[in-house]
Amino acid sequence: LTEGISPENQEVLKKVVAKYGQQIQFYTVDKKVFANCPISRHITLATYFRLIMTDILPKSVEKVLYLDCDVVVRHSLRSLWDTDIKSYAAGVIPDMSIDDIRIYNRLQYSPSLGYFNAGVLLVNLRYWRENNLSESFFEIINKYPERLRYHDQDVLNIVLKEIKLTLPMKYNVQHGYFFKDPLISRAYWDEK
């Protein structure tokens, strides 16, 4: 999803993925859809593009593995991709600030429902389409923009709070964990 990667850069990317026997498709997004979305100095409107995947990607695409551009992949993602999420909107990984009560107070839901990082998402597009989640995302953006400190990540957490599958932390270990070891929930300590 892009707001305008130049044709020259598209060709460069196509050559890179071709080396690995893969293909790449570019889908242009109209930024006007995001006119009411809050942004900040380091977060652009592009962060919201994932909220409209159902409107842009072909209906034949029913599942997407979304990775932020700063994610480092060290092993095969096959086991993540093969995770059964048919009954869920998405497979998600807990955020390093999962125990921060201020997040739940700001978003106004129970800490028992958890908070996830949106940098790695296994998305069930069929579920999103059937339940019109894109509309729900924009309802939250329009109704509560002041609550959205972490932009689309907060939107996703609010809408998906009861319809997500929590996945092992090994799929998205954020750098902050290395500085805050005592804050890692004990439930994850034995994970490889």
Task: Go through the PLM ranges and name each one.
Residues 1-192:
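Glycosyltransferase catalytic domains, chiefly GT-A lineage
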